[in-house]
């Protein structure tokens, strides 16, 4: 699949096009131009490193939404084995914007739950663009309770612009479903490890993000509102989204400094979508480290530690001049 380039990546796109053209020439010619191709590839890597080394928060938000970025099921295939998907909330329907099921992580049984967007138009519509309805959150809740019953660690993957705001979702209790998930996750007596892999949009993200350890990929985002939504409220114009992104503190390093996440997982040069397998290997290692740190804790200690994390949200220190 050809890479899709964002607006700020245009110099990189032009260089990649030159490399592609030279490959076609080499295939049809007896002239060896492999050295020139290698030189341009090295230049492309250097340029990508420069561009991604100074991303603004708004550019990071664009990378987090990249259409080729790995989704939950991509990581499930690369990191877990024996995945068996479970469906439905046992009350209304099966929401495909949240996927989950039993799997093995490094040979250990576990439960995996995550938001899932789509790759093409048909799948995006079926998965509601990764925006869960109440039945999606209730499905996640059911799987968490099942994991607790069998004493299985839980891995969740967050990637949503937010909970679906449709009339039907509100009628079926969207806010209740999100709120109840927070309550349930806070008291689970098994390890819960959360990873923000793309967009972490508001309560729709938080509903599966109350964990003992919260990891965040380097170019993912996590915020109470999208930059465009914030700009529309404050400045009455979505054009101010870059300024809103700066003020919202949506990036992984800022959130780590604020104590809202525990670990930033570095991505390959150019983002996770440039090399999904390398990204999966890096994430597998980080997940393994987190699980090892939690496995010696008793159920009571797990609950206490998780509650301490949640109650620390919003703490501040007042400094008087």
Curated annotation (Swiss-Prot):
Q: Name one GO cellular component term.
A: acetyl-CoA carboxylase complex
Tell me, what is one Gene Ontology molecular-function annotation carried by this entry?
acetyl-CoA carboxylase activity
Annotated catalysed reactions: N(6)-carboxybiotinyl-L-lysyl-[protein] + acetyl-CoA = N(6)-biotinyl-L-lysyl-[protein] + malonyl-CoA
What is the first-listed, main subcellular location in coarse terms?
A: cytoplasm
Its subcellular locations are: Cytoplasm
Example GO biological process term? Answer: fatty acid biosynthetic process
Instruction: State which pathway it belongs to.
Output: Lipid metabolism; malonyl-CoA biosynthesis; malonyl-CoA from acetyl-CoA: step 1/1
Q: Does the keyword Cell inner membrane apply?
A: no
Domain of life, per the record? Bacteria
Q: Which residues belong to any copy of the CoA carboxyltransferase C-terminal domain?
A: 39-293
Keywords of this entry: ATP-binding, Cytoplasm, Fatty acid biosynthesis, Fatty acid metabolism, Lipid biosynthesis, Lipid metabolism, Nucleotide-binding, Transferase
PROSITE patterns annotated for this entry? COA_CT_CTER (PS50989)
Q: What is its EC number?
A: 2.1.3.15
| Keyword Lipid biosynthesis in record | yes
Subunit structure and binding partners = Acetyl-CoA carboxylase is a heterohexamer composed of biotin carboxyl carrier protein (AccB), biotin carboxylase (AccC) and two subunits each of ACCase subunit alpha (AccA) and ACCase subunit beta (AccD).
Tell me, what does this protein do in biology? Component of the acetyl coenzyme A carboxylase (ACC) complex. First, biotin carboxylase catalyzes the carboxylation of biotin on its carrier protein (BCCP) and then the CO(2) group is transferred by the carboxyltransferase to acetyl-CoA to form malonyl-CoA.
NCBIfam families recorded for this chain? accA (TIGR00513), AccA_sub (NF041504), PRK05724.1 (NF004344)
The entry sums up its family as follows:
Belongs to the AccA family.
How is this protein named in the record?
A: Acetyl-coenzyme A carboxylase carboxyl transferase subunit alpha
Q: Which gene encodes it?
A: accA
């Amino acid at each position: 699949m050809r890479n899709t380039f964002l607006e700020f990546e245009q110099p990189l796109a032009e260089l990649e096009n030159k490399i592609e053209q030279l490959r076609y020439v080499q295939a049809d010619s007896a002239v060896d131009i492999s050295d020139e191709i290698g030189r341009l590839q090295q230049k492309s890597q250097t340029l990508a490193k420069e561009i991604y080394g100074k991303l603004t928060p708004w550019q990071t938000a664009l990378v987090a939404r990249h259409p080729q970025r790995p989704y939950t099921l991509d990581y499930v295939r690369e990191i877990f084995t024996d995945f068996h998907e479970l469906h439905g909330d046992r009350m209304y329907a099966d929401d495909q914007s949240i996927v989950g099921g039993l799997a093995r992580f490094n040979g250990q049984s576990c439960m995996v739950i995550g938001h899932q967007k789509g790759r093409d138009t048909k799948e995006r519509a079926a998965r509601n663009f990764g925006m869960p309805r109440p039945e999606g959150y209730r499905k996640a809740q059911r799987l968490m309770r099942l994991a607790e019953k069998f004493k299985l660690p839980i891995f969740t993957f967050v990637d949503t612009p937010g909970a679906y705001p449709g009339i039907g979702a509100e009628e079926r209790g969207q806010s209740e479903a999100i709120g109840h998930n927070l309550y349930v996750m806070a008291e689970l007596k098994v390890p819960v490890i959360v990873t923000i892999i793309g967009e972490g949009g508001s309560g729709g993200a938080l509903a599966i993000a109350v964990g003992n350890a919260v990891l965040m990929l380097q170019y993912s985002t996590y915020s109470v509102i999208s930059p465009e939504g914030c700009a529309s409220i404050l400045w009455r114009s979505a054009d101010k989204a870059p300024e809103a992104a700066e003020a919202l503190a949506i990036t992984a390093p800022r959130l780590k400094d604020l104590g809202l996440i525990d670990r930033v997982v570095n991505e390959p040069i150019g983002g996770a979508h440039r090399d999904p397998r390398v990204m999966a290997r890096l994430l597998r290692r980080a997940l393994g480290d987190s699980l090892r740190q939690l496995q010696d804790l008793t159920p009571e200690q797990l609950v206490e530690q998780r509650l301490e994390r949640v109650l620390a949200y919003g703490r501040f220190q007042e400094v008087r001049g």
